[in-house]
Amino acid sequence: MSKVIQKKNHWTSRVHECTVKRGPQGELGVTVLGGAEHGEFPYVGAVAAVEAAGLPGGGEGPRLGEGELLLEVQGVRVSGLPRYDVLGVIDSCKEAVTFKAVRQGGRLNKDLRHFLNQRFQKGSPDHELQQTIRDNLYRHAVPCTTRSPREGEVPGVDYNFLTVKEFLDLEQSGTLLEVGTYEGNYYGTPKPPSQPVSGKVITTDALHSLQSGSKQSTPKRTKSYNDMQNAGIVHAENEEEDDVPEMNSSFTADSGEQEEHTLQETALPPVNSSIIAAPITDPSQKFPQYLPLSAEDNLGPLPENWEMAYTENGEVYFIDHNTKTTSWLDPRCLNKQQKPLEECEDDEGVHTEELDSELELPAGWEKIEDPVYGIYYVDHINRKTQYENPVLEAKRKKQLEQQQQQQQQQQQQQQQQQQQQTEEWTEDHSALVPPVIPNHPPSNPEPAREVPLQGKPFFTRNPSELKGKFIHTKLRKSSRGFGFTVVGGDEPDEFLQIKSLVLDGPAALDGKMETGDVIVSVNDTCVLGHTHAQVVKIFQSIPIGASVDLELCRGYPLPFDPDDPNTSLVTSVAILDKEPIIVNGQETYDSPASHSSKTGKVNGMKDARPSSPADVASNSSHGYPNDTVSLASSIATQPELITVHIVKGPMGFGFTIADSPGGGGQRVKQIVDSPRCRGLKEGDLIVEVNKKNVQALTHNQVVDMLVECPKGSEVTLLVQRGGLPVPKKSPKSQPLERKDSQNSSQHSVSSHRSLHTASPSHSTQVLPEFPPAEAQAPDQTDSSGQKKPDPFKIWAQSRSMYENRPMSPSPASGLSKGEREREINSTNFGECPIPDYQEQDIFLWRKETGFGFRILGGNEPGEPIYIGHIVPLGAADTDGRLRSGDELICVDGTPVIGKSHQLVVQLMQQAAKQGHVNLTVRRKVVFAVPKTENEVPSPASSHHSSNQPASLTEEKRTPQGSQNSLNTVSSGSGSTSGIGSGGGGGSGVVSTVVQPYDVEIRRGENEGFGFVIVSSVSRPEAGTTFAGNACVAMPHKIGRIIEGSPADRCGKLKVGDRILAVNGCSITNKSHSDIVNLIKEAGNTVTLRIIPGDESSNATLLTNAEKIATITTTHTPSQQGTQETRNTTKPKQESQFEFKAPQATQEQDFYTVELERGAKGFGFSLRGGREYNMDLYVLRLAEDGPAERCGKMRIGDEILEINGETTKNMKHSRAIELIKNGGRRVRLFLKRGDGSVPEYDPSSDRHGPATGPQGVPEVRAGPDRRQHPSLESSYPPDLHKSSPHGEKRAHARDPKGSREYSRQPNEHHTWNGTSRKPDSGACRPKDRAPEGRRDAQAERAAAANGPKRRSPEKRREGTRSADNTLERREKHEKRRDVSPERRRERSPTRRRDGSPSRRRRSLERLLEQRRSPERRRGGSPERRAKSTDRRRARSPERRRERSLDKRNREDRASHREREEANLKQDAGRSSRHPPEQRRRPYKECSTDLSI
């Protein structure tokens, strides 16, 4: 599509034809007036009445109107002809005459001067009419000029050559219809003579032949005159003629009639578009300027899908329908080369005098003679004005460059001569020391680079003169452009260079282009000397999807100082307010320390810029865009990639790095050596180091990479500048993040020896302002001798929730305490107790095993959906960005907030079919933790405390992944980054606002305190602990507050608050049961030390590693039945509540033991396994057993290897099998714990409901006595011969679990006294950990609180968690010594949900037991499980026989009356103790093995 848009009211729409017949006497009845000899169009005068009345003498068709302009008469174009020629044409017609006329308007009236002084687009009807007028004028008139005749020109035929005075006199007399200047010479078109020169007019046939194409009788005009005629083009035919003001020339200062005659045709030798002095000229008038065109030349049709249109002011522009863009530039002229300024000569290259007025102006320039401002020059391409002739200016600059080059060559010759003299002198005096001459600057092998030191950047149009590395690349244009921005080209003698690369753009992905590269050629077209706009338009003209071949030259700095504030005028559309940098290893200019003699010259570079800021401001005042145009198609918010070259000095690179607060890698923390780091800015994100991507590397890995660089070597950094700020609560805005490593340790790169360690005492010596590199000298050594951080710690930390600390500088991070506080406050992390959140998009490719994570939550309306367990080595784990506990916001763009769990599963299934998924997750950014004085720095920090050497043995655990390393929290290992969790735990955040406070709660005699404590243990990675490692440093929190309770009435407790101490005793490292004991011993008043937490991680968000217990009972301070083994083997020391980190002990290490099997086994029992989402721990040590006698093993130690096989992801049954199959010996590799064994929450078992841990309800220490599966199935040595999976199938062999089968003879008895029931899944552990026992008084008090009846699923979840409460465990301990009646009341049959038949059997059994204590013992599962001696005393056959006989007798002897009475009595008890709902069988109920 190539067309010109015109408005309907253009004069061409009013043109009409009229045929007028002559009258009987031959009269026509039409009077013609005007004519070119009067400076007018021929127009209609008086019209005869007969013609107007339409009588026989009238005409046919539309009538002629008086005053209408005559354009054609009998097919002859008469515009510009004198009146006598028009009358001659009319007289030649015999009967009828056909006229083509148009009514006069504001633009087209009878004044020829007015119409000729306007400028129109070539090819438009107005332009064609102008050409017709000129052609007709030249038939009778000869143009005149003030320039001298040239060879071959005939005066009076080609031109009338006049002096300037004669020309001005002629103009003043009104003889000239057109007046203009070209190259300083006046040109004019006079009126035709009022009478024919020879007395004869031109015949109609002659006019027809001339207008049909033959122009032999028309004098051939020279190039200058044709260019003068075609110079200025104004696009006004689309305007309403009555509203358009007249457009006058600026040739004269008069505002009268003579001003109308002056012309602006001055300008461009080359074109049909461009220059007039009127301010409406626009860039569309500048492009057909590249090649000289005659008046008859035609640029041809527009390209396909291009369209020509006009603005309201008549300015032409072009529409590209391919890209839906508009341009001022004619696409037909883009590839035409512009003539350089210094090569311009005067008109036709002939000089008569060396005058400015005789110099040829370059394309796009115009000379204006103004009576007020004098003579000045307008650059219509770049929209600027200047007083100096641009040609003379360019020539002077060229001469200056040549002089500079000559001077430089002379200097080089002198230097070479001096060098030769030096060599000769050295040869003659070889025995002497070298002379002082080497102090003289050596010869420079690259003279081009020394040009800027002379005050002018080097420039050349010859690619062979470039000194540097040539790079060839091919880029394909995307929908966003080529992905780079360009600076330079403000002047024709300025390089066009790469300013920056757009992230993920074609240029950045190609990897060859760098900042500062000079663009030499585009598609084999040399662009050296092209203006900025020209090159940009070349790139823009390339269609999307097409490729472009680029030749670049590397080795020239950008032509401005990046520190110069004036350079902000040269900005990029794509990258807002970004300062270009000087890169590519230009140490000659970058390092004033080593080149101090050149500093002044370098700094003076900005003063030598050919374009002053005023010029740039002038450009923008004309309405042009900034000089730097984006090639990225307006990516306004994208960051930019910048290449920086830095040479490592004696003190390092001169900058420090730290983890990015928003994740994604390492950022430049501080610039220490500004001259060395020129081009680098604080806050830059390091993307690549020496072409290697480091975004996915940890802090220490990046540091090690920089440390390994030798001194004096050059490092190429690709940094990302700009983009999005530190995330707060804004929506997802981090598409550029690669990894969310959120520890905020920082690292000094200014000294490679200070990279390793720094003690906290030294950290306070760092100055708050920019310190010199020497200030870090005290930190260069580590008293521990550790040179590099433990890689296992780094790996484990990067895979755990512990690193979720975006703004947590370690004490040794190089900042003083005050600095850290200011740093936190500056990011608003210390201003409010409620942490901010950060959203992140994570794209995952599906593996064969799936995406590698689990989904939790969404089971109730409004319940959030969270990321659960991350499958090791799965897709999510490999990617490294997704974390357990992240809240799921969107799945493939579909919001899932408030949606159901099922919907998310469906979305993930759809994503699985596609093979990839895009997740939007939200995680908490920070959790403020109080700063401790003796805090040990986190190993995630770049500095390590000298008093806490990390165990190198821990490297052996690298394959174990994050699972086992996370369990070191309770053992105080240095591998954790928790706070106060052990010797290695370091505080991450300093807060001046969030401080702990004491809460005192008083309860009545008959009520509990009314709050639920939730403890996080073992696996914070699998939970939803949004507070990062707060769950490790402060594992105990408020999970629920009972409405109306003392805790609720005090008003100071909130769900999510972390508990630091109970009654002044720190509970950071205490087990859940110890805390319960402390509260029970407190009596009616308890004092809690609290730090504000968050309500999002409350009891409804319990994790796989959390257990809960309700402190709502009316218990007394008395406590009974504690387990001696647990207390006597605890190695840990309780820390004081000053919240100092517990000191590291010598036991916090790894060790190996070999045990030989004794008479009763190896003498220890296990807890945990993969099926329970736990690691394996030592649960008990048998008295005087092999494990106890070895002296190394302790309760709570984590088992890492069994007989050389790692326990990572090992099932409990597999561990048993390994130990059994090992023969008489077993070799264990263990990790020292703190004496406490992590509790297991059965509700988190993967065999439970799909809801996972989110479905765990509150568990109160109420009357629900029915026990759930034990995690501690401790087998005697003589029963180890059973199947390794026998504990899973034990319920199938249980006689009590089935009413149809009698007891099996091979039933397994455990120390816990479990009797498995398939119908209920309940296993009755009798011997349990001390925290599992309860006293009777606490149980009765809990019954008064009246737990509500739950559904079977809820009750099943609740009872699993209930067995973790201290009261229940104590109750089991006391069952050994209570009376048969008490045991009878706790019979599991009484706790069942009572259907009549079930209650009937339970009642009959109860009556039979009352009749016979001996049988009562035989029928009690508790008694059977108490000890192996009793199990041996009663054979399975005897127990089976007795139970069957008793059941038969009970069925026969029972009476309905007695049964109903007993049922009523049972119902009365049920009102006090609600019956338990029947549960489904629970698999793998026994997971602990006594070995």
UniProtKB/Swiss-Prot annotation:
Tissue expression summary: Widely expressed with the exception of skeletal muscle. Isoform 1, isoform 2 and isoform 6 are highly expressed in colon, kidney, lung, liver, and pancreas. Isoform 5 is predominantly expressed in brain and heart. Isoform 3 and isoform 4 are highly expressed in pancreas and brain.
InterPro entries: GK/Ca_channel_bsu, Guanylate_kin-like_dom, Guanylate_kinase_CS, P-loop_NTPase, PDZ, PDZ_sf, WW_dom, WW_dom_sf
One term under GO cellular component: cell periphery
Main location: other
Residue intervals of the PDZ domain: 17-105, 472-554, 643-721, 813-895, 970-1066, 1124-1206
Coiled-coil features, chain-numbered ranges: none
Binding of ATP, residues: R103, Q104, G105, G106, R107, L108, N109, K110
Function: Plays a role in coupling actin fibers to cell junctions in endothelial cells, via its interaction with AMOTL2 and CDH5. May regulate acid-induced ASIC3 currents by modulating its expression at the cell surface.
Subunit structure as annotated in this protein's UniProt entry: Part of a complex composed of AMOTL2, MAGI1 and CDH5, within the complex AMOTL2 acts as a scaffold protein for the interaction of MAGI1 with CDH5. The complex is required for coupling actin fibers to cell junctions in endothelial cells. Interacts through its WW 2 domain with SYNPO and through its PDZ 5 domain with ACTN4. Interacts with cytoplasmic domain of ADGRB1. Interacts via its WW domains with DRPLA. Interacts with ESAM, LRP2 and CXADR. May interact with CTNNB1. Interacts through its PDZ 1 domain with NET1. Interacts with ASIC3 and AMOT. Interacts with FCHSD2.
UniProt-recorded name of the protein: Membrane-associated guanylate kinase, WW and PDZ domain-containing protein 1
Native source species: Homo sapiens (Human)
